[in-house]
Amino acid sequence: MAHLMTVQLLLLVMWMAECAQSRATRARTELLNVCMDAKHHKEKPGPEDNLHDQCSPWKTNSCCSTNTSQEAHKDISYLYRFNWNHCGTMTSECKRHFIQDTCLYECSPNLGPWIQQVDQSWRKERILDVPLCKEDCQQWWEDCQSSFTCKSNWHKGWNWSSGHNECPVGASCHPFTFYFPTSAALCEEIWSHSYKLSNYSRGSGRCIQMWFDPAQGNPNEEVARFYAEAMSGAGFHGTWPLLCSLSLVLLWVIS
């Protein structure tokens, strides 16, 4: 009887170890080189030789089509009917950051570690707490200080009766710094925490760069690998306490 229990426990430990390793391997694969299940994303990333202007850094491997990249540069485009000029004309210095933000969101295949499922009519997945390099966030905030807005969360709460977003009743237009007093407030609050201000700098391999030189390769590939491996490893190592407990029971039975 003791021998049978020993064999059963041994098989259980081996099975749990195999399952943990399998989950880690599967998770690592699904977190890398993937596209979100969202409104305009391709099903799988691939080359797009004619990506437009600010979206062109992703042309060798992209989740967006050429048409999507062109629309990302337009005011009130068909993508989301979003009006950047809802409180007067947004400065070109500020708008380029929102265009780049749109290109990153639509085109990047390196956001897998931060993709979350959502129950929304226009998308099934979103990104959450993507660690944005501190310089990119700071520059975005600095370049938008002379532009105006009427809300701190641009994901919801707009008046869409005209077919595009307008300020809701009672919302007043103020400089960006009124609604976003810090760079962290801008990057983290504007899209419902899609981004999180990172303490890491560009080139560290630990934060996502909104801007990069494609001639030097895409630095976000390394960043995605780092976080995917960290997440997968956490899942695997999380099973060790239970495995150790079972092993102790096994040793007790054998003795």
Swiss-Prot record:
GO function term, MF aspect, one: folic acid binding
Cellular compartments annotated: Cell membrane; Apical cell membrane; Basolateral cell membrane; Secreted
Covalent lipidation (GPI-anchor amidated serine), chain numbering: 232
Residue ranges annotated as propeptide in the record: 233-255
Pfam annotation, one family: Folate_rec
Family, similarity comment: Belongs to the folate receptor family.
Stated role: Binds to folate and reduced folic acid derivatives and mediates delivery of 5-methyltetrahydrofolate and folate analogs into the interior of cells. Has high affinity for folate and folic acid analogs at neutral pH. Exposure to slightly acidic pH after receptor endocytosis triggers a conformation change that strongly reduces its affinity for folates and mediates their release. Required for normal embryonic development and normal cell proliferation. Required for renal folate reabsorption.
Name the UniProt record assigns to this protein: Folate receptor alpha
